[in-house]
C-alpha cells in the first residue's frame, strides 16, 4: 500500500487529522523512567499506545533520538508502531537535503532501517536531491514549503521574477512536476493560515499537508482547518507534540497524553463538521 493510500485509510478509520509528534526530551520524562537505559523508547512507546486511537499518523523527530545516541531506540519504536498499530503511517521528520549519492543513503536509512512510510525533505538543492526518495514509489516525500518558524520568511517569502513568493513556487513545483507518482506532500505551518490557504488553493485536493505549529507554537485550530482542509474535509496531518507528550509528568502521564490527543482530535473534528 502506498503512503497516500495508507494515510487516506487512517483519516477515514480513525476519523482524525491529528498527527502525534514524538520529540522525546529526557529532562521532561516522568520520574519512573529516570536512569533507565531505554527510557526514550519506553516513553515514546507508551505515548504511542495511549494516543493511537485518536491519531492519523506518528512523526518521530530524528534529532531527539540521535542527540542521545538513541537511534536503536528509534528503530525499536518504529518496529513497535508497525507491529501494534499497522494502520497508522510513520512520518520520519529529518528534513534531509543533500546531493544524490548522499540522499540515496538517507533514503535507505529512513525507509530500510527505520521502515518509515514517509520522510520530510528540503527542496533547496532541487529535484536531483529529491529523486532518490521519489525512487521509493510506495513511500511519501514531504517537502518543506512554508514552515512554522518566524525565520522561514527570510527565504520562503522572497518574490520570484513572476511576483509569486518562493513558498508558492515550491508548492507548484511539487504539485505539478515532482508529484508524478502521487507520493509528495508539503510542510506548511499552522502559524501562517493565509499562506496555508494559498498553498491549498494552488495545489488542489490531491497533495496532503503536514501542518506543524498547533499548541505550543500558537497555531489556531479553527483557522488551520478552514485554510488547509481539502474539499473532503481531510488532506492534512495536523501535528502536535509537546502539548500531548508532556500533558502531565505525574503518574497519570499516559492517561493525560491520551486525553490531550483525544481533545485535540475532537477540537479539529468540530471545525470539520
Curated annotation (Swiss-Prot):
GO terms for biological process: 'de novo' pyrimidine nucleobase biosynthetic process; 'de novo' UMP biosynthetic process. SUPFAM superfamilies: Ribulose-phoshate binding barrel. It catalyses: orotidine 5'-phosphate + H(+) = UMP + CO2. The keyword Lyase applies. The active site is at residue 95. The keyword Lyase applies. InterPro entries: Aldolase_TIM, OMPdecase_AS, OMPdecase_type-2, OMPdeCOase_dom, RibuloseP-bd_barrel. Keywords: Decarboxylase, Lyase, Pyrimidine biosynthesis. CDD domains: OMP_decarboxylase_like. Pfam families: OMPdecase. SMART domains: OMPdecase. It comes from the Bacteria. GO terms for molecular function: orotidine-5'-phosphate decarboxylase activity. Pathway: Pyrimidine metabolism; UMP biosynthesis via de novo pathway; UMP from orotate: step 2/2. Belongs to the OMP decarboxylase family. Type 2 subfamily. PANTHER family: OROTIDINE 5'-PHOSPHATE DECARBOXYLASE (PTHR43375:SF1). This is Orotidine 5'-phosphate decarboxylase. It comes from Bordetella pertussis (strain Tohama I / ATCC BAA-589 / NCTC 13251).
Amino acid at each position: 500500500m502506498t503512503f497516500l493510500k495508507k494515510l487516506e485509510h487512517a483519516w477515514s478509520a480513525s476519523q482524525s487529522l491529528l498527527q502525534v509528534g514524538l520529540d522525546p526530551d529526557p529532562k521532561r520524562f516522568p520520574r519512573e523512567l529516570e536512569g533507565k537505559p531505554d527510557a526514550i523508547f519506553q516513553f515514546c512507546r507508551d505515548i504511542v499506545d495511549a494516543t493511537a486511537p485518536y491519531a492519523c499518523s506518528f512523526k518521530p523527530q530524528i534529532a531527539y533520538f540521535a542527540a542521545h545516541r538513541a537511534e536503536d531506540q528509534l528503530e525499536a519504536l518504529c518496529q513497535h508502531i508497525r507491529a501494534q498499530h499497522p494502520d497508522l503511517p510513520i512520518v520520519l521528520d529529518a528534513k534531509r537535503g543533500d546531493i544524490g549519492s548522499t540522499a540515496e543513503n538517507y533514503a535507505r536509512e529512513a525507509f530500510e532501517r527505520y521502515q518509515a512510510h514517509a520522510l520530510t525533505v528540503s527542496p533547496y538543492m532541487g529535484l536531483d536531491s529529491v529523486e532518490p526518495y521519489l525512487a521509493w514509489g510506495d513511500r511519501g516525500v514531504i517537502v518543506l514549503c512554508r514552515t512554522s518558524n518566524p525565520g522561514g520568511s527570510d527565504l520562503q517569502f522572497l518574490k520570484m521574477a513572476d511576483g509569486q513568493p518562493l513558498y508558492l513556487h515550491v508548492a507548484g513545483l511539487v504539485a505539478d512536476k515532482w508529484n508524478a507518482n502521487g507520493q509528495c506532500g508539503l510542510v506548511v505551518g499552522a502559524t501562517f493560515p493565509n499562506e496555508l490557504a494559498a498553498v491549498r488553493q494552488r495545489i488542489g485536493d490531491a497533495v496532503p499537508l503536514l501542518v506543524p505549529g498547533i499548541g505550543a507554537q500558537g497555531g489556531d485550530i479553527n483557522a488551520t482547518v478552514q485554510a488547509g482542509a481539502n474539499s473532503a474535509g481531510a488532506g492534512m496531518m495536523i501535528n502536535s507534540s509537546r502539548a500531548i507528550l508532556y500533558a502531565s509528568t505525574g503518574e497519570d502521564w499516559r492517561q493525560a497524553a491520551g486525553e490531550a490527543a483525544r481533545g485535540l482530535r475532537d477540537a479539529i473534528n468540530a471545525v470539520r463538521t
